[in-house]
């Protein structure tokens, strides 16, 4: 195969070519992953970006997303409103202490109220004062122009709003908002010079064509960062009994997303531990970014395990926007 060589030299795969690569059973997954690694290495070397999530508001949501344990159909006991500013700031302090490059503040719900945006912006201003090098990502749901402008002014660097699935499959996943609603929010953030982060959830019953459509939709949207989540089935949700992924299938998905979006930050995100299992390290041959710590309502593995995984691969944490002593602190953590 010379796919990687062509891409590195400026060639862009067509949708049909990507589909053929992804579905051709004569192409071994590790062969495809090797092509993805060549592309990843060309653009990002062996560096890995670290991201951390704070669940700032949980379970209070009118939406019916079929994958989500915080949807309107789930009567969770651990629901809570937007947490105090001090707790949001404390989360950022913890992120900085753990050598994290991007701190993501996440809220459940359809979208933020203006009062909630005020709350977030005040928190972000203090975070930026304390940790000017820490990138702040907001994930607050559907947002409007005025809210985007205020978030930008406060110092928000990135906004996450996932497409989650293909346009064709969207209404099978959720009915309380449209695919176009999601695209519009990402476009609004771009118009306000906030870096767009948008990704997918795989393993919800979508087809191979849906996955290729997702990869190209994100390419067209020009998302700077693409988190790839793998369904972690939650009992009681629409997809709570779904179990169609294997570690090798997950690796193939990550590989094709890299080949379609060669220059973008591709992150292995929610569900990586339960779906990739012992093959987690191989995902970083195509992806160049991970979430560390816990997710929204499911647990992750200890940070030190991720640091060790990166080190064992011969890779290194991307410290480009972190304090100068970050690399030394990581080494001290691993040797402790």
Swiss-Prot record:
Which coenzyme or cofactor does it need? [4Fe-4S] cluster; [2Fe-2S] cluster
Q: Does the keyword Iron apply?
A: yes
The biological process GO terms on file are: biotin biosynthetic process
Q: Which UniProt keywords apply?
A: 2Fe-2S, 4Fe-4S, Biotin biosynthesis, Iron, Iron-sulfur, Metal-binding, S-adenosyl-L-methionine, Transferase
The record places domain Radical SAM core at: 43-269
- Gene Ontology molecular functions: 2 iron, 2 sulfur cluster binding; 4 iron, 4 sulfur cluster binding; biotin synthase activity; iron ion binding
Membrane found in the keyword field: no
The note on cofactor binding and number reads:
Binds 1 [4Fe-4S] cluster. The cluster is coordinated with 3 cysteines and an exchangeable S-adenosyl-L-methionine.
Report residues binding [4Fe-4S] cluster.
61, 65, 68
Q: Which PROSITE patterns match?
A: RADICAL_SAM (PS51918)
The record's function comment reads: Catalyzes the conversion of dethiobiotin (DTB) to biotin by the insertion of a sulfur atom into dethiobiotin via a radical-based mechanism.
Q: What is the protein's given name?
A: Biotin synthase
Q: Which organism is it from?
A: Staphylococcus carnosus (strain TM300)
